[in-house]
Design a protein with these regions (language model features):
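Substrate-positioning beta->alpha
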Residues: 50, 77-84, 89
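Glycine-rich beta-alpha junction loops
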Residues: 10-16, 70-74, 91-93, 101-103, ...
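Acidic/polar loop patches that form or flank catalytic/metal-binding clefts of enzymes
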Residues: 62-68, 94-95, 120-124
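C-terminal glycine/acidic-rich active-site capping loop/insertion
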Residues: 27-28, 32, 57, 84, ...
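Glycine-rich phosphate/pyrophosphate-binding beta-alpha loops
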Residues: 49, 75, 98-106
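Beta-strand scaffold of nucleotide-dependent catalytic cores
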Residues: 5-8, 96-100, 123-124
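Predominantly a Rossmann-like dinucleotide-binding segment in NAD(P)-dependent oxidoreductases
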Residues: 1-77, 131
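Glycine/proline-rich active-site loop of Rossmann-fold NAD(P)-dependent oxidoreductases
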Residues: 61-62, 77-79, 93, 106-110
Length: 172
């Protein structure tokens, strides 16, 4: 549908650490910001790993090398809370991974776009029932679950008619 993969762009933005990070007492009492409890990484170890996995899973290509620029705000807490990563994947495909837990106002914004030589795909975790497909001719298509235009594999995983959010059936 999109042809040969040429570019991948994934971001995972949250804002939950923003009100905590500016208060020294809260900073020191939050386990995610404590390297003895959380390990050597905060943002990348927490959500960056999910974004990284999304790149490899979605494209089917392995990351072969990367260059990361990680950010912390206070000398007394050098856990990364934000970062940008340049990716090189198999076949020379380039990508960008951006993750932040100080993106003010963001909730759980995982988003991936994969661009090929004939089109592109975009999916957002906060709008999981929509897959955006762009093509060379400029047409934007929006795919949602439960429609006959979906593949047999997709239809086999859908329990309800179009318009029902996936997972609601299981939650009730």
């Amino acid at each position: 549908a999109i042809g040969k993969v040429q570019k991948v762009d994934v971001q995972y933005y949250q804002g939950w650490i923003n009100p905590i990070i500016h208060d020294k007492d809260k900073r020191s009492s939050t386990w995610r910001l404590d390297p003895t409890k959380a390990g050597i990484s905060c943002c990348m170890g927490d959500i960056g790993t999910h974004a990284f996995n999304m790149v490899e899973y979605t494209t089917g290509l392995r990351v072969t090398s990367l260059l990361a620029d990680l950010n912390y705000l206070y000398e007394d807490n050098q856990m990364d809370i934000d970062g940008n990563v340049l990716l090189r994947l198999q076949g020379g495909v380039k990508g960008v991974l951006r993750a932040s837990q100080i993106a003010t106002g963001e909730e759980n914004g995982l988003k991936i776009s994969v661009y090929g030589d004939r089109g592109g795909l975009t999916w957002e975790q906060e709008n999981p029932n929509r897959l955006l497909v762009r093509s060379d001719d400029g047409a934007l298509q929006v795919y949602t679950p439960g429609h006959s235009y979906n593949s047999a594999l997709s239809l086999g995983g859908t329990k309800l008619p179009p318009g029902h959010p996936e997972g609601i059936f299981d939650a009730m």
